Amino acid sequence: MPRLFLFHLLEFCLLLNQFSRAVAAKWKDDVIKLCGRELVRAQIAICGMSTWSKRSLSQEDAPQTPRPVAEIVPSFINKDTETIIIMLEFIANLPPELKAALSERQPSLPELQQYVPALKDSNLSFEEFKKLIRNRQSEAADSNPSELKYLGLDTHSQKKRRPYVALFEKCCLIGCTKRSLAKYC
């Protein structure tokens, strides 16, 4: 008899545990309709939760798959590559075949570095090069947004803010889930 009682007690505890998990997971799917400061406060509250709940949130949304090692590149290498590409485009005596190749694909950093000595052969000093870049950027600032996009000079911060603005507008006008707010933590 005591075994049967303990078995039923264990079964009851397991059912309560499953119910509490379902209730705890439900908060993520609650729809909230907030604007302005209230929305920012809710975002801070959601992002300020304990780390285990953030980890579980990210595991539910996107299963972890190992990325290939080739995709992991330090950001300073990408910036160096972009800088070298910009410099190579302004070199006057650079062969047109190389300029065409640069526009078609993204070359690797070591591949680009072999052409950097061409800067020494050109008549363009570093100060003149900086002045040329500044002039091009000021011309682009006067241009319309489509030309800015074409030149690649539109600001990075605007690109970063776009998803937030769209989400905040949606939360204010229609409503959004706490799960969607937690994705931007």
From Swiss-Prot:
It comes from the Eukaryota. It comes from Homo sapiens (Human). PANTHER family: PRORELAXIN H1 (PTHR12004:SF14), RELAXIN (PTHR12004). PROSITE patterns: INSULIN (PS00262). This is Prorelaxin H1. GO terms for molecular function: hormone activity. The lineage of its organism: Eukaryota, Metazoa, Chordata, Craniata, Vertebrata. Residues 56-158 form a propeptide. It is found in: Secreted. Residues 1-22 form the signal peptide.
